[in-house]
Amino acid sequence: MLTKRIITTLMLNNGTLFRTKNFKPDYRFTLNFVDMWSVDEVILIDITRDLEFKDDSKKKFFQELLNISKNSYVPLTVGGGIRSLKDIEILLKNGADKIILNTASLKDPKIIQLAAKEFGSQCVVVSVDAKLK
């Protein structure tokens, strides 16, 4: 029988951490909520609308990722704005246990295999955004 796991998703927008309900921000829930409920994994998504992963706003994201990874004992899966193997390397060095590829996997499907070969298949997750009509 499969074990049930509780996984929560947190969003970061320009350095502000929040949780969403039905894709709408709900600022009442933060990392304290995550610790309180003893989740099994945290998914951290940077939804900042920047064109380049290296922009200054990403420094806030890296800092928050480091902060969360130092103060949390659950695996961190991180995504948002990943466009290259270098981006993946930066996230893994800053505390991510796994990374999420979304748009990059559509634009360049080879990045999935390259990332799995470089960093291990256990840390590569591909997500698909779907909306029912």
Residue spans for each PLM region:
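Conserved N-terminal beta1-alpha1 strand-loop-helix module at the mouth
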Residues: 1-74, 85-86, 90-93, 107, ...
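Short hydrophobic/aromatic-enriched beta-strand-loop microsegments
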Residues: 97-102, 123-125
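Short beta->alpha connector loops at strand-helix junctions that form conserved
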Residues: 80, 101-104
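A short, small-residue-rich loop immediately preceding and capping a beta-strand
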Residues: 74-76, 80
